[in-house]
């Protein structure tokens, strides 16, 4: 076991060196190099399933390399890595969520067709965002989670994710109702609902009309509109 861990540490250290020293543009022209890197990445990535593993020390390097490998396309091997990341996240490693964000963004925007072809992909990403917005993960991570939900809505407009809109809107407005200190997080939560308005106005209104939160007698629709108007100055675009 100790020998295996040592090999893994050395392997990921080597991958980190590659990530820092190689040009992604050059590697894109040599598919065999990219395929080899993806295979090498998935081997230590598999050992990330246990947060007790010393490989967690290299988590940021693994995420950085995976991001670079998914900027132009997302291979089947890289889609498998999403499941591994989710398992790691479930083991109280959500402190790394902000480091995951660039890679998760690639999953959504670079290969939207594959994202939507398997409901599990979207479910995994939503579950991660929901956990960050539900627990005390800190407003920086919460901003990233809300932003990712907004990106999904905008990226998938007209792609049949109607069933996701109520889930996305509810989780951000519930977070908003708990009180938000920073204008940035408040704005990001509102932007998810605004993206839903752009996606399908009737669906958003129906969603808001059917939402009810404890300890808040004010109609959700009115609260959303009032908060939006009050924070207009914070919207940068």
Kindly label every feature range from the protein language model.
Residues 1-3, 7-237:
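Karyopherin-beta/Importin-beta family HEAT-repeat alpha-solenoid scaffold
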